[in-house]
Structures are given as C-alpha cells and as structure tokens.
Amino acid sequence: MILAALMPCFDASARRYRKKDAVFRVDIRQDEKLRTDFQQPLALMSCIGLKYDLEARLRSYVAFLAGEELEGRAMGSAGSSAAAFFISGFFRNAGLEVKVNTFSSAGHTGRNILGMKRYPGANRYVVVMASYDGLGRLGGKIYPCADANASGVAALLELASDVHKPVGRPKNFIYVALDGHNVGMSGGEALVNYLASQGINPSSIAMVINLDTMGSTLVPPSGSGKDYLIALGGGQMAYSMMYSNTGLNLDLSYDYYGSKGFTEMFYSRVSEQKHFLALGVPCVMFTSGITDHTFKTTDTAATLDYPVFARRVEFIRRWMRRF
C-alpha cells in the first residue's frame, strides 16, 4: 500500500534522469517485472520528507539487488547495468552530483557510480564505498550475493540519503558504488585513478569507509552476541565510535575474530580499501564477517538479520555525522 502510494512520485522523478542514464544498456521500461521491482526501492527516496522504516528500506534495497531478475550482478552483465542504473537514480534523487567512472578489466566494462556532496569552503573529502557487482550466474545457477555485497550497497544508499551539514570543519562526501570487486577488485584501483584525474589526491582524502558484507549475524566474534559489528581500522577512533554507539549497544570489534593474521589480510589485502591504504589514506572497513553462505547460491536476502543490520547502519550514520 505504501509503495503503491509512492509510485506517482517515482514516475515524476524518474523522468528527470532516465534520459541521462540511457548509457546503461538494460532497458528497464521494456521489462515490466524488472521495472516494478526497480521502482519499489527507489520510490522510497522519491518523496522528500516521507518517513519510512529503516529496516524496511534496507530489506527493499537488498531484495531488489539480490533478486533473480538481476542474476547476481556480474560485472558487464545486464543485471549489473540495471543495478548501476538504479544506484545512479537513487543518488540523483538524494540530491547528489552523479558521476560515472567507466573502466575496463579482463575484457569487461565496469562502472563505478559516484554521488558527490560538496560543501562551501571544504577542501578535504570523505569517501564512502561499497562494491555492487556479484558473481552472477555460474554453472547455470544464480549467485544472489545478498550479504556479499548487496547489504553493503544497501547501507551505502541509506547513508547517502542522509545528506547533512557536518559538525566542525566541513568535508565533502563522495559515495561510491564500486564495480569489479570480483574481477581483481579493479573498481577500487579505477576509483583511485579517477579521483586523481579530478584533482582529488590522497592527501586531500581525510577518510575512506568501506562497507563490505554487512547484514549477517550468523558468525559473531567470540564473547559477542548477534548484536555485533566489526570495524577494521577503527581502533584509533574507538572513543568516537563508543559515543556513537550509545543506546544502540552493538558489540564493536576492531579485529577480525581475534586473529592478527586474518585482520591484516581482510583489512589490507582482500577489499577495496587496500588501494587507499597503500597511499597512506586512513581507512575503516565495516563488516559482519564471512559466513557459510558467502560465495554460494544460498547467499539470499532471507539470510540477513535486518533488525541488527538497521542498527549497524544507524551507528555508522551517527559516527559519520561527527566528521
């Protein structure tokens, strides 16, 4: 009922950007099922001022991105193009300046989607990113990649919609949906090069936040309940994180399950923040860890714990407001 009521607002806003986004190959207008599924989550952002439940929004974003119609969002696929189209429209509806960073890797064309919010007098940047490509269809089976990493993209969208006036010295915000995670993390490298081409060098980036696999509670760290969140690289900001966690009561961990080796691997080698770390940029990677569903056909939207997921996103939102 709520979504049906929102559809006129979506249709009005969609006309503003559909022509601009014609570069994306998939034509959602010709596929009524995909068009309906596409409109539902985007409609939640189309009417400014309408309050809607955070948990329900996250469910809607993940359900669309991990749905059968997008077939796992493999880089260069029609499903990936549909996801890119959706994300760019979402950013535009949120009032962000949208840029598309196109790159090639392993014979595929990738697209990083950037949503930028600049503030007068600000000369430093905070980059918030999540990879949106998945494994796609392998051996005739679809790998939905809901937790890894439709969940991170859902968190990214929610944070991008919270355009706020920073506390203290203002910083510009760049929200990035990265392509190419499953093709050598090529989107992260392409992003570094693209930002440099725009005059945004490592010295002007105050922080990079990577949202990578955010929605599960199946593998809590030792001594924690299911209400946990892992923040690799966050130890030096433990006080501000503790303050932002007031009332949310998440169990925050600053290492990967107590293992120094795995912490170094996940923080420095197996996700896109590694490209920025190599340049000396401070980074935090938020994750809920790998589960038995990761990189399997069972990584579906139904396996996520949305009440806890919503609290994680709210925590990151509060923490970012302190920048």
Sequence positions of predicted segments:
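N-terminal hydrophobic or amphipathic helices/low-complexity stretches enriched
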Residues: 15-78, 117-118
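Solvent-exposed loop/turn segments at secondary-structure junctions
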Residues: 69-72, 91, 97, 104-108, ...
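His/Asp/Glu-rich mid-to-C-terminal helical/loop segments that flank catalytic regions of hydrolases
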Residues: 24-26, 291-323
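Structural recognition of the beta-strand scaffold that forms the well-ordered cores
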Residues: 64-66, 113-116, 125-129, 174-177, ...
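Second-shell loop/turn segments in exported
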Residues: 43-52, 68-78, 103, 140-149, ...
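Alpha-helical metal-binding/catalytic segments enriched in His/Glu/Asp
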Residues: 115, 128-134, 138-185, 316
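A non-catalytic alpha/beta surface segment that caps or lines the substrate-entry region
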Residues: 60-64, 72-118
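Metal-dependent peptidase/peptidase-like ectodomains
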Residues: 168, 178-283
